[in-house]
Amino acid sequence: MSLMNLPEESRPREKLLALGPKSLTDAELLAIFLRTGIQGMNAIELADKLLKEFGSLRKLLSSDENEFCSHKGLGAAKFAQLQAVVEMTERYLFEKIEKEDALTSPEHTKRYLTRMLRDRHREAFYVLFLDNQHRVLKGEILFEGTIDAAAVYPREVVKRSIDYNAAAIILAHNHPSGVAEPSQADRRITKRISDAVELVDIRVLDHFVIGDGEIVSFAERGWI
């Protein structure tokens, strides 16, 4: 059945405008993004089918171009549109932490870092560079590695911190395994970076380890 033949209150776009986006199911939200269905399926039916094929909305949003375009009803144009939505989301979250004290808005910082790192298939090491008021100057992935490790060089962290005239930094990296519990290697590299940046009067304020649905803070555990 075409969406136009559904009662107005059942059409995703009209439902969103009347009740807000939180009232919609994942399939209804995806249907608005898709706009149209395929032969024999309206946009909601196609969205429901795609969610079952991908396994979840998150997996669909984090898929690469080849995987995305291999599904019927999706193509390069939709992939480009999706990447624009994802990038706007990341910039929105970065602006939120950029305008606030990174220490007094830890939830925004955690949300941003989770969005940046959680769905990566390889380990990535991310640094937030802060000024002396703990406002964000820049965020950058400095190192990327294999599925279970990234080579991290303290001297490069020092160099980039000086480049951005940072007074403090926040470290973060993901565990592609999904388990956020920090390893002994994580604790050792944090100590090495802390010692290195302290030589140029820069502090490490925290190190977050991002898992699947969990984030561990070194500062909250008293390790920094």
From Swiss-Prot:
Disulphide bonds annotated for this chain are none
The alphabetical list of record keywords is: Hydrolase, Metal-binding, Metalloprotease, Protease, Zinc
The record lists Zn(2+) as bound by 173, 175, 186
Q: Where is this motif: JAMM motif?
A: 173-186
The MPN domain covers 102-224
Q: Name one GO biological process term.
A: proteolysis
Pfam families hit by this protein: RadC, UPF0758_N
Is Nucleotide-binding a UniProt keyword of this protein? no
What GO molecular function annotation could you give as one example from this UniProt entry? Answer: metallopeptidase activity
**Which InterPro entries does this chain map to?**
MPN, RadC_JAB, RuvA_2-like, UPF0758, UPF0758_CS, UPF0758_N
NCBIfam families in UniProt: PRK00024.1, radc
Q: Which family does it belong to?
A: Belongs to the UPF0758 family.
Name of the protein in question: UPF0758 protein VFMJ11_0123
Native organism: Aliivibrio fischeri (strain MJ11) (Vibrio fischeri)
Kindly list the organism's lineage: Bacteria, Pseudomonadati, Pseudomonadota, Gammaproteobacteria, Vibrionales
